Design a protein with these regions (language model features):
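Catalytic cores of the polymerase beta-like nucleotidyltransferase superfamily
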Residues: 1-141
Length: 141
């Protein structure tokens, strides 16, 4: 995934400019890149699945609230995804503070993890979306 990240990132940005969400953009960019690679080289499915998974995990590093951080650090490929995130800092795609936060988060005890997540409340642009209730129409009979 590290070898192909720069091209995947460029493809992702082109999809974002077309109006796709961050997750859909990276999903399409990764699929397109892997199709190009498979025309010239042979990779086993398990390696292709790993590359795809590492790329898709990058979108989850933007979520600091709720259960997302806890489920991400339990993921089997979390450490590899964190290394890819560190590479993205060198490419100026991600702030170093993000990598430091995730590194500290996965190493600290559970009690501190809860405090870290609560400490991020209000600092991120994340907001929970709620469905708007529809008003009942009053009958005029």
């Amino acid at each position: 995934a590290v070898l192909f990240w720069e091209k995947i990132s460029k493809l992702k940005m082109s999809y974002i400019e077309q109006g796709f969400s961050d997750y859909i953009s990276i999903q399409r960019a990764t699929s397109e890149m892997l199709q190009d690679i498979n025309q010239n080289f042979y990779f086993q499915r398990k390696h292709i699945a790993g590359i795809r998974e590492l790329c898709l995990l990058q979108t989850r590093f933007n979520k600091f609230l709720g259960k997302s951080p806890f489920s991400l650090i339990r993921h089997a490929r979390f450490r590899s995804a964190l290394k890819l995130l560190e590479l993205r800092v060198k490419l100026n795609e991600v702030k170093i503070e993000t990598v430091v936060w995730w590194d500290k988060f996965h190493r600290c005890p559970d009690s501190e993890k809860i405090e870290m997540v609560n400490g991020m409340r209000g600092k991120t642009g994340q907001r929970r979306s709620y469905k708007k209730r529809r008003r009942k129409k009053l009958s005029t009979t």
